[in-house]
Amino acid sequence: MERIKELRDLMSQSRTREILTKTTVDHMAIIKKYTSGRQEKNPALRMKWMMAMKYPITADKRIMEMIPERNEQGQTLWSKTNDAGSDRVMVSPLAVTWWNRNGPTTSTVHYPKVYKTYFEKVERLKHGTFGPVHFRNQVKIRRRVDINPGHADLSAKEAQDVIMEVVFPNEVGARILTSESQLTITKEKKEELQDCKIAPLMVAYMLERELVRKTRFLPVAGGTSSVYIEVLHLTQGTCWEQMYTPGGEVKNDDVDQSLIIAARNIVRRATVSADPLASLLEMCHSTQIGGIRMVDILRQNPTEEQAVDICKAAMGLRISSSFSFGGFTFKRTSGSSVKREEEVLTGNLQTLKIRVNEGYEEFTMVGRRATAILRKATRRLIQLIVSGRDEQSIAEAIIVAMVFSQEDCMIKAVRGDLNFVNRANQRLNPMHQLLRHFQKDAKVLFQNWGIEPIDNVMGMIGIMPDMTPSTEMSLRGIRVSKMGVDEYSSTERVVVSIDRFLRVRDQRGNVLLSPEEVSETQGTEKLTITYSSSMMWEINGPESVLVNTYQWIIRNWETVKIQWSQDPTMLYNKMEFEPFQSLVPKAARGQYSGFVRTLFQQMRDVLGTFDTVQIIKLLPFAAAPPEQSRMQFSSLTVNVRGSGMRILVRGNSPVFNYNKATKRLTVLGKDAGALTEDPDEGTAGVESAVLRGFLILGKEDKRYGPALSINELSNLAKGEKANVLIGQGDVVLVMKRKRDSSILTDSQTATKRIRMAIN
C-alpha cells in the first residue's frame, strides 16, 4: 500500500508525467531488449503505436500506379516519402479501404473449393440445433479426439506427396502416389484447382486440413466425433452443458462408425468358421466401406475399438498396448506381475483353472460410460475409484473390476454352474465365464463383498451393495468420484501376434484382445458396407443368401460351366455354396443333393438335355453331401421369409424366375443378373467343353479310321483329323485346332455343328 501511495503522489506532480511521456528512452538494456532479434517483443503496443501514425503500412512502388494519391474525400492515400531503409512507399490505412471498394476483382470460383472445410463448417453450424443449457457437474475425461471434420485419412507422408503433386507439380523431388485414395484425390484436386490464383502456400495448408486426421487429447463429457469436437467450446463448460445436434455429418465420422460395425460383423462371423483367422482375413480383403477397400481404411484409420484392433492385428499392423476386459480398456500405470495357473472352487463347488496375476499393479479402466482407477494385489482388490454417467454404468465398472481382481469372495459368490459358450459353441475361458455370470446378476457378489466405514474426502462418496450412494459406508475398497479418469493419452503402437482363434497377444504373451471382448451392439452403418465374401451373405438374412448365391453363379458362369462338366466335385465344394445350405431343410439336404447330382450326370451323358437355367437353379442344392436314394422331386424347398418356399425343378416360381425375353433372372423379385448366352442353345453343350481345342467338321468320315473315344483325342497332333464318339453313340469328324484355343471355344457354334453333323 505504501508503494502505491508513493506512486500516486509522484504521478500527481506534473514533472513526473512529463518525464515519463516526453523523455527519450536511452538506457542501453531497454533499447537492447526491444531491438535485438527480429521477433516483435510487444506486438499489441507496436500495433497501437503504428496505427496512430499517418502511414503505418509499407507497399511496393507499383501501388502508386494502381491507387490514386487521394480518395473521393480528398484524404491522402500514400506518401511520396520512401520507407526508411527500403524502396517501398508509405501507405495510409485508408488505401486498404479504397482497394477493397475500388480495386480489381478476381474470380471467386476457387474459394469454396480451397476453403472447403470452412464453408462446410459454416453450413453445419447454420443447420445445427442448439438446445437448452443445463447447469450440472461435468464429468470430463481427456480422450484422444479428431479435431478436424471432413478429412480423408492419409498419412502425413502420403498427404505431403499429394499436396506437392497438386500445388507444386513442377518442383523437383520424388513423389510416390501409390494408394487408390492418393490417386483419386490428386486427380480430383488438379481438376478443381485449375487456374487457381490463391497463394500456393494457403492452398497447401488447406489441402493438409482436408487430407490428414488431426487429433488432440481434450477433456470431453459428451460426443467424441469430430462434428461435436468442433463446437466443444460451445457445448460444455466446467459446470454447464448446452445440448447440440450437428447440422450435417462428415465422411470421416461416418467412416469410423461404419468401420467399427463392419469389423464387429466380420469378427463375429469369423469366430464361427472352421479357420477363424483365415476367414477374417478373407473378409477384410473382400469388403468395401463407402467404396473404399476395408484393408486400406484399416491401414490409415487410428480408431481403437476391440473388433477393429483384432482386424488390424490379423493384418500385421501395430495396435495400442492396452488390453481389453469386459468392454473396458485397461492400461497398467505402475507395478508388475507374474502369471501363474491356479485352481479355485466356486460357490457351486465347480473347479475353475484361472491364470492368477501375482504382484501389486495399478490400472486405469476406461469404458464408454464409466472410468476408474484400480489398485490390486494378488487376488485382492485394494482400491477402486469409479466415476460414471449413472448408477448402471458405475455398477458395470465395479463388476468388471471385482472379477478382474480374482478375489476369493467373488469366486465364492457364484451360484449355479458356469457354462457360457461363444458363438461357435465353445466354452468361454474361466475369467469370461465369471464375468458373464455376474453381468447377468451381481446381487450375491455385491452382498458378499463386504462394506466399511468411510472418511469424508472431498469429491468422493461411498456406494452401497444396492448401488445407492452413502457418505458413511461403502463397499470395501470402492469409492465413487466426481472426477473422471483420463483415457490413456499415448498413441504408441506395439507389435502383436494373433492366433487362429483371433486371440491377440503382445510380445510378452499377455492376451490383449479376444473375440469375447467384441461388443454385441448392433448399429446401422452410415456408409454402405459391401461384403463381397460369401461368408457375410447371411448378415442380411436368408433372402440375401439366396440372391447372392445365384448372383455369384451368374457372374462366374463361364468358369462354373467348365467345372460343371469337367470337375463337378470341386465345384460342389466351393465355399460360396455354404451359406445356402442353412436354407435347405436339414432332413432334405442329402436327398436333394443326391437327386440333383444324378440329374446333372444325365445331362452330361445325354446330348441336348443340357439346360443352363436349370443347372444354375439346382446347382446350390448339389453342394450338400449326397444321399443315394431313388427319390425324384418336382420342387425343392428353401426356408425364406419365415416359411418354406418352393423352387420348381422344371419351370419358374416366385423364388426363381427366368425371363426368356429379357434373359434376366429374378430371385424373390430381386434382379440377380443376366445370362449372356442363349440357354436354348444348350449353351456350350458339354461336348464343346469336352472338345475344347477341336473343330467339329461334320458327320463321321470313314477315311479317318474307327471312332476314337474322347479320352483318346489327346494323342492327335495339331491339324490332324479324326472321328470321335460323343454323347449317346453319335460319331462326328473333328480336327485338332492349329492354335491353342481360348478356354471356351465359341460354344454355341460347336453345339450347332454337333446337331447338324448328327442330323
Curated annotation (Swiss-Prot):
The short motif Nuclear localization signal is annotated over: 736-739
Q: Its Gene Ontology biological processes?
A: 7-methylguanosine mRNA capping; cap snatching; DNA-templated transcription; symbiont-mediated suppression of host gene expression; symbiont-mediated suppression of host mRNA transcription via inhibition of RNA polymerase II activity; viral RNA genome replication
User: GO terms for CC?
Assistant: host cell nucleus; virion component
Q: Does the keyword Protein biosynthesis apply?
A: no
List the residues marked with site Avian adaptation.
627
GO molecular function annotations of the record: RNA binding; RNA-directed RNA polymerase activity
Indicate where this protein resides in the cell: Virion; Host nucleus
List, alphabetically, the InterPro entries matched. Answer: Flu_PB2_2nd, Flu_PB2_6th, Flu_PB2_C, Flu_PB2_CAP-bd, Flu_PB2_middle, Flu_PB2_N, INV_PB2, PB2_helical
Give the domain of life: Viruses
The alphabetized UniProt keywords are: Cap snatching, Eukaryotic host gene expression shutoff by virus, Eukaryotic host transcription shutoff by virus, Host gene expression shutoff by virus, Host nucleus, Host-virus interaction, Inhibition of host RNA polymerase II by virus, mRNA capping, mRNA processing, Viral transcription, Virion
* Keyword Ribonucleoprotein applies: no
Summarize the protein's role: Plays an essential role in transcription initiation and cap-stealing mechanism, in which cellular capped pre-mRNAs are used to generate primers for viral transcription. Recognizes and binds the 7-methylguanosine-containing cap of the target pre-RNA which is subsequently cleaved after 10-13 nucleotides by the viral protein PA. Plays a role in the initiation of the viral genome replication and modulates the activity of the ribonucleoprotein (RNP) complex.
State the family it belongs to: Belongs to the influenza viruses PB2 family.
Q: What is annotated about its quaternary structure and interactions?
A: Influenza RNA polymerase is composed of three subunits: PB1, PB2 and PA. Interacts (via N-terminus) with PB1 (via C-terminus). Interacts with nucleoprotein NP (via N-terminus).
The protein's name in its UniProt record: Polymerase basic protein 2
Q: Which organism is it from?
A: Influenza A virus (strain A/Turkey/Minnesota/833/1980 H4N2)
Q: Which gene encodes it?
A: PB2
